Amino acid sequence: MCPMILKRLLRPSYLEVLDQKSQRLKTLTEDLVEASKASSGNLKLEMADIDLVELVQQTNGEFEERFEQRHLKIISDFPDGMIIIRADGRRLWRVLENLYTNAFKYAQEGSRVYVDVASVDGKAIFTMKNISEKPLNISPDELTERFVRGDVARTTEGSGLGLSIARSLTQLQKGEFVITIDGDLFKA
């Protein structure tokens, strides 16, 4: 290789860009594999009793600093006491992580993200609501399809697999994953 070209390629800015792109490709590949396994049911689940209230509180803590970057405020409503569910902790964490990441990317900057945990008729219910920064001109079913994003202009990074993975992982654990859209209100 020509020394001049090699010298240019080895500049820190080029290396940083190459590193970022390779990390993005790695993440996309991992997401594709996980989406495929989750939707086909080919994931081994390690079911255990999990306190959903505690897990969501921990998730709030994990994302709080990140949300502050976009001036998003988490407003939570939790019951007194625990809500124990039978789930795979790692897979359930991934569902929550995907939902919180979705809120971080697409919620209107400076707005609130509402997170509720409740028990209704013996069922644990997790709800997240936020106002979308851009109009949601897409159906809830389309949002959970692979490679579909609410940000049609694609101004944010992402593979369009997050909600699809979250839905598949929830269903794999015998849960329900429901999204509703009312104007620019997103609710999962």
Predicted regions, residues:
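Short beta-strand/loop element within the Bergerat-fold HATPase_c
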Residues: 110-122
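Conserved catalytic submotifs in the C-terminal HATPase_c
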Residues: 46-50, 68, 73-83
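Short conserved segment of the HATPase_c
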Residues: 135-148
